[in-house]
């Protein structure tokens, strides 16, 4: 029995496709719409070197389906045409931010702010402006009048100061001299205040007890005070100085009749022999007493 002859079927081979065929275009260039759920595949590492294609059949510009930063990487100018994607685009934008003029000036001024402040404010704030003369914009007649008036006012002020000083100086000197003459008197106490004198008189408890002390207030016209005890109450009567210390009077000003004395000692001597009228300022009661008991604290 003979075997049937073997039939050799013809083998059909697919024609060879070049690098830019349809299969390659599916990987490199997708002209159709992209599926939003599937991200595009990254390009192979063998076909890229610093963002430039090595294969000569690589498309020279990206198509609408595949976004590749080829044109941005080859263009050195700053991107002003829209947002730039890719690593090279980000580096370019960062370099542009650090080269802004305002930030350069700030970085230069930051290490040494004092010289900048001195240069910017030396002509205005650090050097005070020179005041202009008041009579620069006035006529000569008005300027002369103002100068004469200012000179007259200054002279009057100086004269007033001299007058006040000359009127106070004799009073102070006379009160100091009178104070020196009173130091030996048993009824005078130059180093006691009002409270200590009143305590001493109240402790003595006799009408007519008295004491002369320095006044509490800074009154040059009332350097001394006479303290007298009457009916359990202490009366403080000012001793006024008149005529630059040449005369002394007892009581406040405004009295119709007052007796003048040449010294405080003469006044005390007079009221040891003559009654001294006293008026209570709170109740208005009047009383008479003599200066009988000089008291020391």
From Swiss-Prot:
The keyword DNA damage does not apply. Keywords: SH2 domain. Residues 1-61, 74-93 are annotated as: Disordered. The lineage of its organism: Eukaryota, Metazoa, Chordata, Craniata, Vertebrata. The gene is Sh2d6. Residues 36-45 have a biased composition (Pro residues). Residues 187-295 form the SH2 domain. SMART domains: SH2. The keyword Nucleotide-binding does not apply. InterPro entries: Immunoreceptor_sig_adapters (IPR051751), SH2 (IPR000980), SH2_dom_sf (IPR036860). This is SH2 domain-containing protein 6. Gene3D superfamilies: SH2 domain. One of its GO terms (cellular component) is cytoplasm. It comes from Mus musculus. PROSITE patterns: SH2.
């Amino acid at each position: 029995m003979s075997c049937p002859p073997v039939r050799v079927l013809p083998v059909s081979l697919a024609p060879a496709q070049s690098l830019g065929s349809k299969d390659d275009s599916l990987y490199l260039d997708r002209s159709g719409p992209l599926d939003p759920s599937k991200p595009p595949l990254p390009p192979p590492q063998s076909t890229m070197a610093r963002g430039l294609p090595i294969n000569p059949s690589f498309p020279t510009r990206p198509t609408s389906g595949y976004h590749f930063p080829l044109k941005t990487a080859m263009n050195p100018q700053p991107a002003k045409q829209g947002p730039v994607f890719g690593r090279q685009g980000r580096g370019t934008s960062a370099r542009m931010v650090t080269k802004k003029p305002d930030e350069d000036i700030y970085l230069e001024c930051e290490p040494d702010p004092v010289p900048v402040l001195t240069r910017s404010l030396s002509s205005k704030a650090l050097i005070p402006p020179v005041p202009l003369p008041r009579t620069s914009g006035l006529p000569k007649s008005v300027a002369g009048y103002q100068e004469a008036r200012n000179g007259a006012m200054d002279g009057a002020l100086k004269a007033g100061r001299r007058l006040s000083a000359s009127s106070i100086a004799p009073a102070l000197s006379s009160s100091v001299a009178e104070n020196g003459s009173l130091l030996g008197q048993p009824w005078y106490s130059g180093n006691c205040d009002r409270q200590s004198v009143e305590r001493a008189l109240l402790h003595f408890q006799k009408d007519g007890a008295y004491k002369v002390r320095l006044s509490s207030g800074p009154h040059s016209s009332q350097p001394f005070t006479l303290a007298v005890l009457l009916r359990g109450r202490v009366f403080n009567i000012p001793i006024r100085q008149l005529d630059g210390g040449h005369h002394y009077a007892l009581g406040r000003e405004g009295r119709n009749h007052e007796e003048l004395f040449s010294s405080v000692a003469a006044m005390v001597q007079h009221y040891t022999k003559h009654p001294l009228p006293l008026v209570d300022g709170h109740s208005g009661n009047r009383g008479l007493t003599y200066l009988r008991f000089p008291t020391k604290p």
